[in-house]
Amino acid sequence: MKLLIVFGLLTSVYCIHKECSIQECCENQPYQIEDPCPIHYYSDWFIKIGSRKSARLVQLCEGDYGKRIPIHYEMFGNYTISCEPLEINCQAPPVGSLIVRCSYDYDFVEHHDVRVVLDFI
């Protein structure tokens, strides 16, 4: 229990210094993630593998907006259920962290990333 409290505090401190969204979901149940991007912004979802700024981003959905479909990777199992809106199987990402890239432009020339932390209930 103490470890869980310490982890929660560390996550909160991390989120204060970086853009972060904490969301609650029931473990191993379908969960529709709330999009933390501002209204009228495009969002694209990734798993960030590694902790460095230059870490690899693995895209979770593909296709044009309005017709996006999940990309299923063997290493992630059935993590992504649907894309518009993003629905996942509520569990910690198999590797790395869940990231949403927000951009006002369709081509994501200028963007900012938001880390999404799932709190399991």
UniProtKB/Swiss-Prot annotation:
The keyword Signal applies. Residues 1-15 form the signal peptide. Keywords: Disulfide bond, Signal. Pfam families: bCoV_NS8. InterPro entries: ORF8_bat_SARS-CoV_HKU3-1-like, ORF8_betacoronavirus, SARS_ORF8_IG. Residues 19-121 form the SARS ORF8 Ig-like domain. Disulfide bonds join C25-C90, C37-C102, C61-C83. This protein corresponds nearly to the fused 8a and 8b proteins of SARS-CoV. This is Non-structural protein 8.
